[in-house]
């Protein structure tokens, strides 16, 4: 099985990439393991997503226990309850596509080998899947 993350860490031409990771605190041992993205839609815009950063911490612990290197990132979530009844409602449905696209971009750009997606509402769940 191909390990995509090797594209960003293996070989002398990837020394600058490794330097970026090391600037974030990763070790050579961390870089030798598969990279698993841990994405959440946690934010302070909606109550169903506000707790997700804490769940992401637990997911990262699980990734570490499984022998991989977690890489956390977040994406948006729009609250229908707050966006309702004004111009903001036009943003709600499209937010699913933005969530999906932003996750795909992060995974592709950083060559993550796997993804744990954590979401909490009717738009962020399908966008994350």
Regions from the language model: what does each represent?
Residues 1-129:
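Metallocofactor- and cofactor-centric catalytic cores in central/energy metabolism, strongly enriched
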């Amino acid at each position: 099985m191909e390990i995509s993350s090797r594209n960003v860490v293996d070989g002398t031409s990837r020394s600058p990439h490794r330097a970026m990771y090391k600037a974030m605190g990763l070790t050579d041992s961390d870089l030798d393991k598969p990279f698993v993205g841990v994405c959440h839609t946690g934010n302070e815009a909606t109550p169903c997503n506000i707790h997700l950063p804490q769940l992401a911490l637990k997911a990262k612990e699980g990734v570490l226990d499984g022998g991989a290197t977690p890489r956390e990132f977040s994406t948006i979530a729009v609250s229908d309850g707050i966006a309702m009844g004004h111009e903001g409602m036009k943003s709600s449905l499209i937010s699913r596509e933005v969530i999906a696209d932003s996750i795909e971009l992060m995974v592709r750009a950083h060559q993550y080998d796997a993804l744990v997606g954590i979401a909490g509402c009717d738009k962020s769940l399908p966008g994350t899947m």
